[in-house]
């Protein structure tokens, strides 16, 4: 089949202005809970999101990460500060997120400013991770070139001996980020590509302007 022939109709739901919460975080939570309920029997990471960053030269990169927290400060994720995304955010602390739930014919796009999560909060999350994941945070020099997989596995085995108990400290180069949204767009697929799109834009008084966009 030709790529040009790959298409589908979107028929599940519509989205009206009166359906929207005045607070975009509350609106996101509503959609997220619906996604969890609808997709809980499928092998899908509902909290998976594409994180787009750019370095100081404006060269973009993107990858899928997992949402690990959400409050009035914003969207929280964790990573190695020395990774490509960590370097990008150090040079250019703005980023975008995309959540795509195709089974619900929905997408949420978010843009905002990024800051590091306070270290005590990052430590609490780090200590909640499985032992293997905590060891992997030490074993991986994320985004650096390595000789082969055996090198990585050997390092992991060394760390198992170095940290024989459940107590494994958080690496100093590992932690969390908060993306504080300034713009969010909620997209609902509709028939004939007449999709519903609503954008929230943060105003100087911290209120949110809600506008319908053309598909």
Residue locations for each model-derived region?
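Binding-site signature for planar aromatic cofactors or substrates
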Residues: 1-215
């Amino acid at each position: 089949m030709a790529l040009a022939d790959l298409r589908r109709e979107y028929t599940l739901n519509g989205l009206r202005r009166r359906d929207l919460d005045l607070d975009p975080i509350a609106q996101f939570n509503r959609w997220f809970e619906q996604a969890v309920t609808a997709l809980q029997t499928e092998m899908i990471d509902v909290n998976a999101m594409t994180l787009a960053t750019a370095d100081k030269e404006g060269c973009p990169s993107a990858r899928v990460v997992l949402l690990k927290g959400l409050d009035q400060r914003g969207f929280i994720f964790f990573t190695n500060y020395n990774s490509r995304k960590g370097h990008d955010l150090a040079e250019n602390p703005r980023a975008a997120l995309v959540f795509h739930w195709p089974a619900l014919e929905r997408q949420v796009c978010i843009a905002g400013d990024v800051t590091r999560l306070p270290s005590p909060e990052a430590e609490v999350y780090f200590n909640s991770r499985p032992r293997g994941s905590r060891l992997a945070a030490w074993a991986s020099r994320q985004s650096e070139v390595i000789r082969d997989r055996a090198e990585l596995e050997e390092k992991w085995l060394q760390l198992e001996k170095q940290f024989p108990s459940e107590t494994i400290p958080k690496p100093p180069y590992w932690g969390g980020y908060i993306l504080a949204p300034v713009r969010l767009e909620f997209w609902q697929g509709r028939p004939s590509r007449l999709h519903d799109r609503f954008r929230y834009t943060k105003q100087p008084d911290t209120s949110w302007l809600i506008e319908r966009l053309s598909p």
